[in-house]
């Protein structure tokens, strides 16, 4: 079959741009909604533990926040990867095809170059660490202080502590602050 004259590299690249930006938009919505789901899970577990007077129920909180936090982090990383791909690969290729150096998508770089970007990224990292690090850690501390103990619950709590620490470390590592 002969290639169609209607299909050009530029059209293919623009179609790819549209697709990756749509994926990025979808992932942003999903990631942001994960915070609401995490807050709902926290309230549910804390309310249930308080109502039932069973501190062991607090052990559900680190599990829930770790699962939701890893999902949040994975989506956040993909969102950043899409932006980086558009800035460093797709945009410049389209610019070259158009006879202009650089990327035709100015916003992809412009919003990353303001003077308060580093401050915002640090604040966002702290905000991310609260639901996915501080709150589950507080639940574990409350369990250790007020729980009945026992080998298996304490063992589970220590495994959860390791998972929460690993997630918190990854949140800090992935907190991209470079322009």
Give the residues covered by each predicted segment.
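Cytosolic-side membrane-entry/anchor segment at the start of a transmembrane helix
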Residues: 2-47, 174-179
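Hydrophobic, membrane-inserted alpha-helices
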Residues: 39-46, 63-65, 134-142
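Hydrophobic core of alpha-helical transmembrane segments in multi-pass integral membrane proteins
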Residues: 128-144, 157-172
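Hydrophobic alpha-helical transmembrane segments
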Residues: 51-62, 147-162
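Inner-leaflet juxtamembrane helices
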Residues: 61-109, 168-179
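Loop-to-transmembrane boundary segments
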Residues: 28, 32, 105-137
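Terminal, low-complexity, charged helical segments
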Residues: 3-8, 12, 45-53, 60-67, ...
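Membrane-interfacial loop-to-transmembrane-helix junctions in polytopic alpha-helical membrane proteins
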Residues: 21-24, 53, 116-123, 148-155
């Amino acid at each position: 079959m002969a290639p169609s004259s209607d299909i050009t590299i530029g059209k293919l690249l623009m179609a790819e741009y549209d697709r990756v930006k749509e994926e990025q938009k979808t992932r942003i919505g999903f990631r942001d909604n994960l915070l609401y789901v995490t807050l709902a899970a926290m309230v549910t577990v804390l309310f249930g533990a308080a109502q039932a007077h069973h501190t062991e129920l607090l052990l559900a909180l680190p599990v829930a926040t770790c699962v939701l936090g890893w999902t949040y982090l994975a989506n956040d990383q993909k969102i950043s990867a899409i932006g980086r791909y558009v800035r460093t690969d797709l945009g410049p290729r389209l610019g070259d095809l158009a006879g202009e150096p650089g990327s035709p998508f100015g916003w992809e770089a412009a919003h990353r170059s303001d003077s308060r970007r580093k401050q915002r990224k640090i604040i966002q990292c702290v905000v991310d660490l609260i639901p996915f690090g501080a709150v589950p850690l507080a639940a574990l501390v409350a369990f250790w202080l007020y729980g009945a103990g026992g080998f298996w619950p304490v063992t589970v709590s220590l495994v959860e502590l390791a998972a929460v620490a690993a997630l918190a470390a990854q949140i800090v590592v992935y907190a991209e602050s470079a322009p």
